[in-house]
Amino acid sequence: MASVLCYADARGIPSHGCNRADTYVNEIAAGLVDACAEPTVERVEGCCALVDGRNGPGAVAAGLAMDTAIRLAGEHGAAVVCVRRSNHFGAAGYWANVALERGMIGMSMTNTSPMAVPTGGKTRAVGTNPLCFFAPADGDDSFQLDMATTVVPIGKVEVMDRIGRVCPPGWGVDRNGNDCSDAREICVSGGLHPLGGGADTAGYKGYGLGVLVEVMCSVLGGSDARDIGPTIRSWSARRDGPLGYAHAFVVIDPGRFAPGFGERLGGYLAGMRDLPGDVRVAGDPEREYERDAAENGILLHGNVARALKGLAARVGVEDLPGALEGLDGLGARSSLYE
């Protein structure tokens, strides 16, 4: 799990980085997540498999599922693996990147607790349900799409709340379904807009994508009825039972199709970047941020660093990186490799 958190912060995705550490620890401390659970591969049929997360940490179940998908894709050319009875698995891109590093196309997705208000509705009923697609190109290049199916992931709103800032217009709504910029209100009582916003700006497309992810994860994976869509428990240490999250992973070996995939993709991406203006492709900003983090360390907001120090004291961790010990009001840098 620590690797997943560092991956996110190192790529400039603080919503899924160390900002979430206390939530993971609180879940285990409250007995809501079984830290000792060992996920199992329940079923394998050709290039398809089903994993039971057994209410353990989501990252552990996701690791087993992606390893299984890569193995099956190596045998069959492509693979689909679903996971049920799991928990939050961190940034979806971390798991797609595992396939990318093996020279394969990787897709990862997960359902989440309902945070989005569907088009035409007034109450939250769909998760942020992220969808991720990574594809390798020649020259160490790649296409890396990692997106929530809401305007923003809820973690971004949580970060805005933690650092005391208001949200930009269009991110979410209050308890009455009206547009809202108060981060706490969006998180606690309101909800997020689907990707695209309201009906007049094609928010129904984001809503549809969110449902697509739900179908691929919980419906295809055989989750219990209460672990699908609107009835999934809130991701909180105060909830009354397991989350029952579900994930799906797709891995494709491009070498099983037309030769020259990496060269063609590399040429396509280069052509997009060469367009007039400042055109980048999915994954470029994160790679730039990661290069800086590898050289200078991961930048944490001061409030997040302070929360980490408090968490460390609570669980008895004493040997913190020096940057965290000497943090100031602007934040702290901790080495990517510490």
Model features per residue range: what roles?
Residues V41-D52, L64-A79, V173-L192:
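Residues forming anionic-ligand binding surfaces in small-molecule and nucleic-acid pockets
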Residues M1-G17, V33-V44, R239-G244, R280:
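N-terminal glycine-rich anion-binding loops that anchor highly charged ligand groups
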Residues R165-I228, I232-S236:
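Secondary-shell segments that build the walls of catalytic and ion/ligand-binding clefts
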Residues A49-D138:
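A generic, well-ordered mixed alpha/beta core segment in the N-terminal half of proteins
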Residues V215, L220, D224-E338:
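Catalytic-core signal marking the mid-to-C-terminal active-site face
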Residues H16-I70:
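Active-site cofactor/substrate anionic-group-binding motifs, chiefly glycine-
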Residues A116-C187:
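Phosphate/diphosphate-binding glycine-rich loops and adjacent basic-rich segments that engage nucleotide
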